Amino acid sequence: KENNSEETSERDCIGFCVTGGVFSEGIDLKNESLIGCIIVGTGIPQICTERRLLKDYYDEKDGNGYNYAYTYPGMNKVLQAAGRVIRTMDDVGVIVLLDERFARSEYVRLFPEEWADYKLCNLKEAPKLVAEFWDGHS
């Protein structure tokens, strides 16, 4: 969790983290210390007794149990991870969501309004879109 960005500022590096892990809060990678993230999966929590009880409760209340027990907590993790990239008005970066479920309307409606210009693509098209983004921001 220690921020060693000063030590590595002269070289490019790639870090791998788990959503909801120690890097989800309490670290501030300023300026160009973090210029992108690739989030694999929707962050849905594992099935357990607590989640089943939560799902059952909200299913009875409003029929929306799966979202409260799984979708919303998972998306919260995704948004926290994505939020590491853009911390200030001056930050620029790429957020790539790798999971077909993110293209579904029930996920798109959970995107922040700042993501309104998102692009859908397949894995083959992704490098081109990322390159075009950086060409427009260099």
What are these regions (language model features)?
Residues 1-138:
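ASCE RecA-like P-loop NTPase motor cores
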